[in-house]
């Protein structure tokens, strides 16, 4: 089976292609000009070289099969692998953006886009609140399949080449359980699509022994930890992984995470009614994160089919956030985007092609 050209970093292509400058030319065609056929690259390449590319590599290995649009402008995409027909989802989040013009100090309003990518089909972690785990684990995604999610979404929305995306590994799967492919995808996002590592966030459920491995790659990405509880008993009931990597084990590795000045580790905290949304829980969370440069992102539980949990009130979420902020721990409440199309946090899963999304 031919290798996907999107599976190769710039360095790998430079070593493979002769002369090596062909790699940079090819990267421009792939990631700046969105070409999906080697024949469309004839301006730079000879017929013999194009024949070589067609013989050795393939381009697109996934396709969009369904798109659902939310009232807030966000979109959920169902992708199908062209190799094994398995499906997976990704989400485009559309948000308002404000910037200050450095020359006039005027406030400029615009839009920013975040692509929530999947790194696995299904998930092995088995969090009880997450819809993804309902379908079980199928396989890891290749770097090329991760990259193509962003490429196809950008292409589908006619976003200009210069429009920067934010990438969050918060879709289906646990990124640290597919670390090699995730790291390769991050490198290609950076060198190919020109997405700064500062715009890329890797979210983990707490695979503690792989956090230092990710740190050692020196990729410069942002780290997010799915915490969701302030004691091991509650966290283990929500996230079985906690029985192997308990809260203190995870926090010990987070304390070693290299942070740039003014940067913080994000802790995601899913608020579930009458389980972990009390003021007492907020006080315990403050104590847990003492000494860690952190910020807390509160997520109100998003209901899904078969779930036993309930969404808390916005009032209780504000009380939780207000307490943390009053004590100097930066805390925000995440706006639930794409809730009406079941594309919010914890709502993605593999679907059969016959199913509507």
Swiss-Prot record:
Keyword Disulfide bond tagged: yes
Catalytic residues as annotated in Swiss-Prot or TrEMBL: 89, 345
Broad class of the protein's primary localization: cytoplasm
Intrachain S-S bonds: 116-345
Entry keyword Methyltransferase: yes
Keywords on record: 4Fe-4S, Cytoplasm, Disulfide bond, Iron, Iron-sulfur, Metal-binding, Methyltransferase, rRNA processing, S-adenosyl-L-methionine, Transferase, tRNA processing
Identification of the protein by name: Dual-specificity RNA methyltransferase RlmN
Gene source species: Helicobacter pylori (strain HPAG1)
Lineage: Bacteria, Pseudomonadati, Campylobacterota, Epsilonproteobacteria, Campylobacterales
């Amino acid at each position: 089976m031919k290798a996907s050209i999107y599976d190769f970093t710039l360095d790998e292509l430079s070593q493979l292609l002769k002369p090596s400058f062909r790699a940079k030319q090819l990267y421009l065609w792939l990631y700046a000009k969105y070409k999906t056929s080697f024949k469309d690259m004839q301006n730079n390449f000879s017929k013999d070289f194009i024949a070589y590319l067609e013989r050795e590599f393939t381009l697109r290995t996934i396709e969009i099969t369904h798109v659902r649009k939310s009232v807030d402008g966000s979109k959920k995409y169902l992708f199908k692998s062209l190799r094994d027909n398995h499906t997976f989802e990704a989400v485009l989040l559309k948000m308002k953006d404000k910037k200050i013009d450095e020359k006039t100090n005027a406030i400029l309003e615009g839009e920013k886009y975040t692509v929530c990518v999947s790194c696995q089909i299904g998930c092995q972690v088995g969090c009880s609140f997450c819809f993804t785990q309902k379908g079980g684990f199928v396989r890891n995604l290749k770097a090329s399949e991760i990259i193509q999610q962003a490429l196809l979404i950008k292409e589908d929305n006619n976003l200009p080449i210069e429009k920067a995306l934010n990438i969050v590994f918060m879709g289906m799967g646990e990124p640290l359980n597919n670390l090699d492919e995730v790291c390769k995808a991050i490198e290609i996002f950076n060198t190919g699509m020109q997405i700064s590592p500062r715009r890329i966030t890797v979210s983990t459920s707490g695979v503690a022994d792989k956090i230092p491995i990710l740190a050692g790659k020196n990729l410069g990405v942002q780290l997010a930890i799915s915490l969701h509880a302030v004691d091991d008993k509650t966290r283990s009931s929500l996230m079985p992984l906690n029985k192997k990597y308990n809260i203190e084990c995870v926090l010990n590795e987070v304390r070693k995470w290299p942070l740039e000045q003014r940067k913080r580790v994000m802790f995601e905290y899913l608020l579930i009614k009458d389980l972990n949304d009390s003021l007492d829980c907020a006080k315990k969370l403050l104590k847990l994160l003492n000494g860690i440069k952190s910020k807390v992102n509160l997520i109100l539980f998003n209901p899904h089919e078969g779930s036993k949990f309930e969404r808390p009130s916005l009032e209780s979420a504000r009380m939780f956030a207000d307490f943390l902020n009053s004590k100097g721990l930066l805390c925000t409440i995440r706006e639930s985007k794409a809730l009406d199309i079941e594309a919010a946090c914890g709502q993605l899963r593999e679907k059969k092609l016959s199913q509507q999304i």
